[in-house]
Amino acid sequence: MKSTFGLLALAAAAKLVSAHATVHAVWINDVDQGAGNSADGYIRSPPNNSPITDVTSTDMTCNVNGKNPVAKTLSVKAGDKVTFEWHHDTRSDSDDIIASSHMGPVMVYMAPTEKGTAGNGWVKIAEEGYSNGKWAVANLIANRGKHSITVPDVPAGEYLLRPEIIALHEGNRQGGAQFYMECVQVKVTSAGTKTLPAGVSIPGAYKATDPGVLFDMYNSFTSYPIPGPAVWDGSSSGSSGSSGSSPATTTAPAVSVTAVPTKEAPVDTSATPTTFVTATKPATTAAPAAPSASSGSNSGSDSCNSGSASGSVKIYGQCGGQNYSGPTSCEAGLICKEWNPYYHQCVSA
């Protein structure tokens, strides 16, 4: 059972740590398209990996700077498997993808480029929430930051794909949920006949008080309502759903529902990408994971002194806590501060 101190520590931690994530690359039919998170790439990437927390902000559309096109556009066709690759820092085997405390759902939206850039016409084509006692983000971490969708049979043209993570480690308070998203520029070259529905506006698809946004993951729960519209069934037209939280109900698939092993590739072949199931299953009751704050402010108790040995933890990195097995010595000039029993962090002395 969580303590008042634990909640305060979790809230306090939000302002310092940056164990966050962005999309670094995309794979098409298991072929690595190379790093895309730069001005000469194909991902409209923000200047850093900080989250968006104001659901009314225009940055919710494609993140900070997301209205600015980038140099490249990936060519895809209906039926192609598109895999998004998230990372905390770099495309390396040692990268932790995102803090293990940042549990929550993973979703993908699609919109025609012009409408999507303006914040309109967004259609949810995939989602994964909480099922069988496991969060979508846990699956993402286990699969080395990869999750996949199948391109629907839409008309030829330019579109944006918008993968999104909602981290709920501070979702117990209004404004605490953290949103991570980017927009990937793609050009559909096949002549599909299934026009996207009208979609929803982003911002506008979520409210700060939606049950799937304002959600306490540290108390026992039996299900999780994934926020936003329902997943498009891939064939119907018209509205794709109203804003608010979608109940965990079965929908006709718009994307592949079976995980397929990837081909060996030069970058990170250690895991198989998750392929989303468009139907969410009712989650079973499970004891929630112990809170592990991922962010903080300069308060809390000092749990250890700073250090300068090789392999020391950098500023804002985790340096201790229950069940933590990594390095505990901070770089010179830093101290390891205890925010709660589960999360200690290197901060300025």
Curated annotation (Swiss-Prot):
GO biological processes: cellulose catabolic process
SS bond partners: 62-183
Cofactor binding: number and manner: Binds 1 copper ion per subunit.
Residues at which O2 binds: 169
Keywords: Carbohydrate metabolism, Cellulose degradation, Copper, Disulfide bond, Glycoprotein, Metal-binding, Monooxygenase, Oxidoreductase, Polysaccharide degradation, Secreted, Signal
EC number: 1.14.99.56
Top-level lineage group: Eukaryota
Entries under InterPro entries matching the protein: AA9 (IPR049892), AA9_LPMO (IPR005103), CBD_sf (IPR035971), Cellulose-bd_dom_fun (IPR000254)
Disordered: region residues: 233-304
Record CDD domains: LPMO_AA9 (cd21175)
Glycosylation sites: 323
Applications reported: Lignocellulose is the most abundant polymeric composite on Earth and is a recalcitrant but promising renewable substrate for industrial biotechnology applications. Together with cellobiose dehydrogenases (CDHs) an enzymatic system capable of oxidative cellulose cleavage is formed, which increases the efficiency of cellulases and put LPMOs at focus of biofuel research.
Cofactor(s) demanded: Cu(2+)
Residues of the signal peptide: 1-19
Pfam families linked to this entry: AA9 (PF03443), CBM_1 (PF00734)
Subcellular location: Secreted
Family label: Belongs to the polysaccharide monooxygenase AA9 family.
PANTHER family according to UniProt: ENDO-BETA-1,4-GLUCANASE D (PTHR33353:SF17), PUTATIVE (AFU_ORTHOLOGUE AFUA_1G12560)-RELATED (PTHR33353)
Comment text on domains: Has a modular structure: an endo-beta-1,4-glucanase catalytic module at the N-terminus, a linker rich in serines and threonines, and a C-terminal carbohydrate-binding module (CBM). The CBM domain is essential for binding to and subsequent oxidative degradation of polysaccharide substrate.
Protein name: AA9 family lytic polysaccharide monooxygenase A
Species whose genome carries this gene: Aspergillus fumigatus (strain CBS 144.89 / FGSC A1163 / CEA10)
Organism lineage string: Eukaryota, Fungi, Dikarya, Ascomycota, Pezizomycotina
